[in-house]
Regions:
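Short, charged/polar "capping" segments at the starts of alpha-helices
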Residues: 17-18, 42-49
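Short loop->beta transition adjacent to catalytic acidic/histidine clusters or analogous donor-positioning motifs
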Residues: 4-7, 27-37, 58-59
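Short beta-alpha junction loops
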Residues: 38-44, 65, 121
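GT-A fold catalytic core of metal-dependent nucleotide-sugar glycosyltransferases
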Residues: 99-130
């Protein structure tokens, strides 16, 4: 059965020493239609500059602060509603999970099937995804 084209979604707090290797590895091993990165505005500008010469699938960078604006949410409003008590997790961690799992709400033309990838997971070999 031929695989349908798919996108990869990554939440990125900050570009690190391995970011290029992760993105180029994903492109090499999985040939995604596109890679969507959700990050803070300042990081988005830096990443656009850094990635110009990288060998990646098309990169689309999205502002995490207003990612859910079309459905009436902002990062601040979501985090303000969380009452975590003595949880080990921060409101920002929960928001990160919403960004990854709710990517279809904030990314126009996202593939029907998409892969959520952690930004620090280096793809050293191809694993079956579907």
């Amino acid at each position: 059965m031929p695989q349908e084209p798919f996108d990869i979604v990554i939440h990125l707090f900050r570009a690190r020493w391995n970011t290029r290797a992760v993105l180029e590895g994903l492109t090499l091993h999985y040939q995604p239609r596109a890679i969507h990165i959700i990050t803070l505005p300042a990081e988005a500008e830096s990443l656009k500059t850094l990635s110009q010469d990288w060998a990646t699938a098309p990169l689309y960078i999205h502002n995490e602060e207003v990612f859910f604006q079309t459905v009436g949410f902002t990062k601040a409003s979501v985090c303000a509603e969380l009452n975590l008590g003595k949880s080990l997790y921060t409101p920002g961690w929960f928001y990160q999970q919403l960004l990854k799992l709710g990517a279809f709400e904030g990314i126009r033309d996202l593939s029907e099937w998409y892969v959520v990838w952690d930004s620090d997971l280096l793809p050293a070999e191809t694993w079956p995804l579907f």
